[in-house]
């Protein structure tokens, strides 16, 4: 198997599991005989967003271009942190996590904003390698 084919396979696997964890973590882990609580579903959704980020990196890395991989890393950071911010915002507002959840919302939201700024905002003038 060539590297390109392997990374395409890795993209598909990561996208499928990432989406499943993001959208329906309880249903996915129930296939393995595991039961999640509402609070542990939050962790499953966060894992899903990170796995989706890896899918983006794998997809861009399949062609081996340094600039494309770097752009994919920036996009993966934006998507994973943006989704984590939204997931944690919901968990904090609904009381699934305590008040410290607001700190994590700010951290992930700030990171998402930074990834957006350096990908699409005024910081975009930074030359990608």
Give the positions of each predicted feature.
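Juxtamembrane helix-break-helix junctions at the cytosolic face
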Residues: 58-70, 92-93
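Core segments of alpha-helical transmembrane spans in multipass integral membrane proteins
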Residues: 15-22, 40-62, 75-86
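Non-cytosolic membrane-interface motifs at loop->transmembrane helix junctions
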Residues: 33-41, 72, 96-107
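Membrane-embedded alpha-helical segments of multi-pass transporters/permeases
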Residues: 22, 59, 89, 113-119
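Membrane-helix boundary connector in multi-pass membrane proteins
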Residues: 86-103, 120-121
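Hydrophobic alpha-helical transmembrane segments of polytopic
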Residues: 6-13, 47, 73-80, 100, ...
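Membrane-water interface at the C-terminal end of transmembrane alpha helices
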Residues: 110-129
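Membrane-helix boundary elements
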Residues: 3-6, 17-42
